[in-house]
Each structure stands twice: as structure tokens, then as C-alpha cells.
Amino acid sequence: MASLAAVVAFLPANGQGRTEINISSKAPSGIIDEMLYGQLFEHIYFSANNGVWNEMIFERSFEPEQYPGIHPRDGYFDGWFMDDDMVLHSPTRYEQPLKIDSLETCDFDVTMDVNWRSYKLARRSWSGGLLDIRFAFRNKQDGSPYYVRIHDPYYEGRTFTPAQTQSQIDAANEAAARAALQQQSATADFSICAMEVRESAGMGGRPGRRMSTLAALASAPASKQQVNEDQVWHKLRIASRGSKATVYWDDREVVSYDGLEQADRNYLTFWVNYTEATYRNIKVTSADGSKVLFQGTPGDVQIPDVAQQWNPFGDGKFNLVKGDAINMEYSQRIVAGKQMTGVSQGPQSIVPGETYVGSIYAKGKGTLVVGLRDENDVWFTQQSLGKVSKEWKKYEFSMPAGSNSGTGEFVIGVMPKGDVQIDQVTMSTQTGLDLGGFRPDILQAVKDLHPTCLRWPGGGYVAQYNWQWGIGPQENRRRWDHWMWMDYDQNCFGTDEFIKFCREVNSEPVMVVSVKFERPEDEYEQIKQDALNWLRYCNAPATDEWGAKRAANGHPEPYNVKYWEIDNEMWEMGIDRYERCVRDFGTAMREIDPSIKIIACGGFPEDEQFIKRSGNYFDYMSLHHYEQQGGYATGPVRLGQQYDRYAQWFKEGPNPNIKLFISEWNLNSIDWKTGLFAGGFLNTCEARDVVAMGAAALFIRRTDSPDWNNAFINFDYKDLFVAPNYQVTELWYNHFSKYRLAFEGETGDLSVSTTMEENGSGVIVKLVNPTENPIELVINGDWEKVSGTDYEYFAPGSLTVANSMENKNAVALKHGRARVNGTQVTLTVDPLSAGVLTIRK
């Protein structure tokens, strides 16, 4: 291979077990930006809320939750809910059934108003899918349903599926296979249909997979006026009579079918898929209209007696009180009987010597008690808050655990005969409060990793985020209205907490503003102004309107946030609209603070033209890559080739100083393959001037999350473990030097990156051997002597070795040395290994 100024390679296997390189160590061949070693700190799977931020209470304001229908595949969707106007709202992703009623007759009418739009919402096209609305109204004798279906395929061909989580990829593949089998119109239609099991085409002579698909029993085309995006209410009526069903849309018959099986019981269920539907005036009557069989609110979306994150106990009564609350809309009422009655939440980790500190708002009559107890109702610690006042009042508590340890639950109890409303509960550990509000073990794990920048608050989270939700007093912050990534974010971790966290871990903040592309044009200027106000809140002096708000929140000095990204993964928006946003937002933001750096999203087919037209409006281009498991070795090679193309485009564009920010990267796995990929990826980036910033994802994840299992830091309510990608990244950063060195020679299957120690005393060689064979590496250099070597490496022996709570060091760091012969250094690089060799001159 020719002389390299910036060297890293994964080359096809040459069958050789030996390779030799010659390093030029007299002077650097280039400068590496340590901002490569950043992380995406997205509010996902409790990374911030109840993760980094040591709030131990979920749903602290006792608001009812939406009904998710099914266990989330990736935790990213909202659920069914009924609003104050008695309008039923559907989820907007995945099939989620909502049961309405069941009937012991085949003769009935179902009527309702329907408002449906078939276009994809923001962040909803990641996994593909069929765009339809269905109502299961009858059953076959075997119990399987008959559906009334309204289907509009217009947007199904406009799905874009980047490499995201494994479940998203699986869902996209399944949707594509089902679409190929499903018999359906190429245009919008109404149909009466049932499920059939069919087999997809196999590959390589293998049988295909069997899957349930919708088969139309009768169908009719739907006009644009009947199926539209204008949010118009339509009247739906389904008339069921024995073996026949007739469907009416806006009082006109649209489709009918005679030939339905007649079951003893029929289940009425709402379904939607990848669209948004709302319903009102839902009513089921007998065929002659004389009897009302169902009317009103489905049971699953009715307001519960107890907020969903809390568990009731005792012999009393409970109800959520609307319109009388400290925070948001609801408070929890507890009426005790003859025993202490209350609500609890767990699990909570009880640590010897720890003190549990918090507060609760209450009103009513009776005595209130808080505490921590085990599953057998044995108290670890408790505190009486005394008799509550008639009006809302804040009660603080501090409960030492003493020598107790174990797993418990937090308890709020009302003593016998009491009648108390509670709201806005919070609890932390004293240790966490002493550290600024952060969970101690997660904070330490982040510090040990040394992320050089933190991209926040997302990610896809940005699309729905409003930064003003997360500033001001904690007790005034409202939680999100919608479920996202398994959580209703409490907004306890906002801008001020994020900046404090960055300073605590010595990391540069990267703020991501939203252009909210799914919003109508008449909101554009306000959306832009919101982004500008956020910049002013962070960087303007206290004499500015928004700087004054920051000062009022306890932070008089500007934060001087340098890096600002214009939203996230904008391929759904399209290049024309997004390019306008980059120009408008970037120009306006630079007028407020000319020192900031603007980051624009790439990943468009038109990136080259985007750079040529608008390169002067931004400083960095943001790209994402999630590699599938099989690409742990080859992925970095392909990425290097891609980054080289961008380097050429930047060079030929109006702003040759643009650099790449690989703002999301990882392998979709949590075993040793992630370590090999991380080492190869970082070597690829260190070798190229064009890559200046990086942010791995996921950063922090709770272990019971249903998907995206590739996080660096993995935690539960009491402990954590780090994954191989964390371990390799930490090792690489601990040996970081900004001085890149060139070398010559064939590297074969090895990934090699060479740098000079910043004090000039040695040479650093970062190595990844992704093969199952050892490779002998011979290193020659222009140094006069070798005084010693150190080799730190991971070589667990198998791709599938993974750390866990039970075995945190399944992938363990090893130490070794190379063989020295004069000025020549020889190292045997173990199979499936990643390590750093230091050659001391």
C-alpha cells in the first residue's frame, strides 16, 4: 500500500499472519480533534429522566397516562386517549387494538364520527407499514375478526428506512413482505376484509415465512373527498344483519358483503396502523335502534382511580381529582378506611447510610406518612408529616436508611379516617443532591468515559421537545403529554441541568434545535423564534430578555454554548424545505451570536448539491450510521470511503472548512462485536481531517427497555454495567493524542491508527484485529531506541461475549508487552481483539 498521511485500513483477508509497517514519528502528519469522542445524550429509555438525574419518582404529578394498547416494540409512540371534548385519539404507530365492547348478536349498528389522515407524522416512517384505519366489528366462528377497512396507499411508497434499531428494521422487513402478499388496491378504497395466512416467497430455495395478511371480501374505491388530509369529520355507519354487513360513509353506502359467518359473540375493536385517527360520538345500538348497547368512552381509556405509575394499598378509596392540583390537571385523592391507606412506587434501592430526601404537596384532613418498606411491609425508614392543612402546602421529608439495605418501595400513607389529596412528589438521595442532583454511579461512569461533547436533547426526541418546558422551578415543570421512549418525561432535566452536567463531566454541550417540519407554514416564524430564544437563554447577557430569565433561574453568566445543530435526520422533510431552514435559522442565530458553530443535517441524496448551494451557512455536516451486527469489521471501511467523498465535496464547495460531525454511530449489538466496531470506527475517524466531531448512541439506557440494546452505559434502579463499546472508547480516549503520524506498509485485516504522544515521548498504535486468527505485526520507526512498550487490550475470545449485571467484566482488560529487537517492535495481535500499544522512545 502506498504511503499514507492518515492511516487506517481494513483490507480483504490476504491469508497472511504477518504484516509490517514503518512509522514516521519525527513530526505529525495532521491534527486530530478530540471532539470525536462525544456522545448523543438523548432523552431515551430514562437516560436523563430517572437516570442521570437522580429523581427517584415516576409520574410525580399524578397525571393519567394514555393507553398503549400493546407492549412497545421500541417504546416510541403515544397511546389511545380521550380528550376533554370527548374525542378519542388513536396512537400513530404500530397496530394497537382498543377494545370497545362485545355483543351476543349479529344484528346491530355501529355509528361514529371519524377524522383520519393517512400521511406519516414526524419520525413515523422509520419502520414502514401499511397506512390504514380498521374497525373489527364481527367474528368468524373460529374467533378471528372481520374488519371494515379504509386504506390509502399513497404514502406507503414514500417510506425511507435508515439503519436504526433492530426491531425497526425487522418491522420494516415484515411490512414489506406483507405488502407483497396483501391483495389491495393501488388507490384509496373501502373494504370489508378478513385475515388470511399466506406464505411469502423464499430465497435460495428456502421456504418463505407464513404471515397473516388482509384479504378483501368486498371493496370499493374511495374518492379524494372521502379520504383526505384536511382533517374533515366524516360519519361512519356499519350495519350488521346476520350474514350481511353494509358500510355507509357520510350517509352514503360505500361497500357491502353478504357471506359473513355468524359467531356466538362479536368483539368490537378499533385498529389503526401508522396513521392518526380521531373518533367521537361512538355508539352501538340494536338493529332497530331501540336499545343502546354501548355509548361513550371505552373502558381502557377511562380515567383510572389511581395514577398508573402508583400502586394502591389499604382498605380505603381512591380517585384522581381534576382541576385541583399543584402541577398540571390532576391530583391523587386518598380516603382511608380503618387502616392506613395510600399509594406506593418501586422498586427503590435502599443503601446503608443513605438519606432519602424529598417533598410532597398535600391538602385535606388527616395525618400523612411517608417511608420506605420492603415487600413484607416491614419499614426500612418512615416519617410522619403530621396533620395536613385544608389548603395546598408543601411538606418536606428526610429519611435516613440507617444500616438497612435491600429493595423496597416508596410509600405515601394516609392514617385511618383521613381524606387527603396529594400532588407533585419528589425524592432523591442526599448523596445525589450533594453531587448537584445527579445519580452517583452514572455520573462516575460518565466521568470515566470522558465524553468530549454531549449532543442534547436528541435525536428524534427533538421533534416534539419544547425547551421552555425544562426551565424554572422543578415544581412548576409540566411533564410531556405524550408517551415517548417508554416514558412521560417529567422535564426535571432541562437546559440548566444539562449545562451543569456538561461542566461536571468536562464536556462541550451541543444543542439541537427543532424546525418542527410537520407543523403548518403559518407557524414557521414562531418556531424559528423559539430556537433564537433558546440561543439567547444560553448565550445572551443578563440584560437581554431571555438572558434575564436564565439569571432569574440562578445562572447570571452566559453559558456560551458554541455548537448548535439544526434539527435531526431531516430526510422526511426533503432537501428544499430543510435547506431553507438551515439558511434562515443559521443566519438569524449567527446575528445573535457570531461566535457559534452551525451544524446542518446531511444524509440527503442531494448532499453534494446542498453543500455547493449552502455551504457558507454552516460549519459542520451531521451524519448518522448504525451498523448491523455482521458489519463489525467491514463497516468502518465503507464509512471511511463515504467520509472521503464528503471531504472532496467540501473541498470543491464554497466553504472548504466544513467538517463532518458523525453525530450518531454504533453497532446494533451489545456484545464484543460493538467493541471491535468502536475501535475500527474511531481509527477511521482519527485518520481523517474531515471528521472533526463524533457522538455515539445510545449513551445511557435502562436495562428493561424493549429495544436499541447497544448502549454504552446500562443501568437499573440500583446498579449499572458498561458495554464493550464503552470499554474500547474509554481505552482509546485514555490514549488520545491530537498528533497524527503517517506510516507505510500493508496492514491486511488489521485496523491501525498511529499517533505521537503529546509530550513527544512515545508512539501510540491503536489496533483492531477483527479476524479469528492471530496476526504478527512488525513495527519499524525512525526512532533511535525503544526504552519499553505497554500493550493494553481486550480479547475475550468470542464475538458473543457480553457484560451484564451478573458479570460486569466478561470483557476484561488485559496487559502485555511487545517484543523489542533494537528499534524494531513486534506484537502478536490476538484474534478478535482491540488494543493500544505504546512504544516509549
What are these regions (language model features)?
Residues 72-304:
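Extracellular glycan-recognition regions
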Residues 408-412, 416-418, 575-681, 690, ...:
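Noncatalytic carbohydrate-binding groove/subsite architecture in carbohydrate-active enzymes
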Residues 58-67, 101-120, 232-234, 298-299, ...:
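Extra-cytoplasmic beta-strand recognition segments
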Residues 208, 770-841:
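C-terminal beta-sandwich/jelly-roll accessory domains of carbohydrate-active enzymes
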Residues 77-94, 319-338:
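Short carbohydrate-recognition loop motifs
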Residues 20-21, 62, 133, 215, ...:
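Extracellular beta-strand ligand-recognition surfaces/modules
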Residues 43-44, 658-730, 734-755, 761:
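Aromatic/acidic polysaccharide-binding cleft in carbohydrate-active enzymes
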Residues 338-340, 345-444, 448:
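Extended acidic/polar, glycine-enriched regions
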